[in-house]
Amino acid sequence: MKAISYVTNEQIENYARDFYIATGKKLTFRTITSKLFEEEYQHYDIPSIPYEISWDSLTDAEFFALLKALPIKNLFANYHASSDDYIPASPIIPHGLDVYAIYYIQNIKDRRHAHDFFEINYVFSGECHMLFENETLTLSPGELCIISPGSMHDVYASDDSIAVSIMIRRDTFENTFFRLLSQKNLLADFFRTILYSETEKANYLFFTTNNSSIVHDSIKTIFMDCYILDSYSNTCAISRIHIFFSILLRHFSHTIQIYNESSSVANQTNFLLILQYIQNHYQTVSLDSLCAKFHYNKSYLSRLIHKNTGRNFIDIVTDLKLSQAIDLLTNTTLSIADISELVGYHNVDHFSKHFKKKYSCPPSVYRNSL
């Protein structure tokens, strides 16, 4: 008997299917992998993983076949759970990695659980079901869900489905997703409020990508750097995640839906539209024009903005104007008057007064100090 060092997704899937057919019951992933490793015999040669090509060159069919052949280490070998429903990044994300991707195996028994990392679920084909405390979300092909740490949920893929999960350590998510929004702090603050609400209630972002090939290719390369392990793998995987989020925000930000247990999907999504409108029209938007655009009365909209951002409308718009002014002062040779006009101030003295109040010096002094 030779010591077993890995099992494949296909072996786990076959074991789960055969047990379910024989008994009508499902086993957990941990139980199946433990049983396979206890057999202490590997029936297959080590899977051949393509090293010489980029996985985004694989067709979807080739990639799906590769997913089933990927080797899975004994993740739970040295793990002793302190809670039945809370799973930390270790053992799920291997030591030394900040990103890890897995394929959802059918006929696996799961349970509602939470963890301390971010989880991105995506469906290539079929359906993937996510069960939250008071809601079930079904993902169809091309749909994607980002689940926040601490959210209690259960996930299972329907028969003959291809669904994957990308798991990202919390600090890595912070340094990729929110960094991309660094010049749109209004949106970043709102997403951060939703995703870091420190509750067991459901908190997630939902995207529709129309089964885009660019999304497929990006996910394939993330998997590549999770399984072809060398001294560059983790750095490359983090870079791939950065690119992946860039693709989502560039091409599919208009499809974002937000769910937070404390508020309905519609309310959160409508407020996101309000923030996006403020972000895109900060030079000219007024509270009156915003109310007319979204059909709210002024007092209600003021309270809604403060509740979701912790700031009032005037402060938000002023910060957006001055943040853009800083960028123009730093990266262009435009005159102070031109910058004032571009960011929405039609009186340069008024602009300078606001700028000095926030940054403790007038715009000209700030530029000369660079």
Label the model's feature ranges:
Residues 1-127, 350:
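Generic protein-terminus/edge-of-domain signal
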Residues 98-188:
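N-terminal regulatory/effector-sensing and dimerization cores
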Residues 206-208, 229-237, 248-276, 280, ...:
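Short, Lys/Arg-enriched, Trp-marked, Pro/Gly-tolerant hinge/linker segments that flank
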Residues 215-234:
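A long, hydrophobic alpha-helical segment
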Residues 280-282, 331:
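Short helix-capping/hinge SLiMs at alpha-helix to coil transitions
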Residues 284, 288-320, 340-366:
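Basic/polar phosphate-binding segments, predominantly the helix-turn-helix DNA-binding elements
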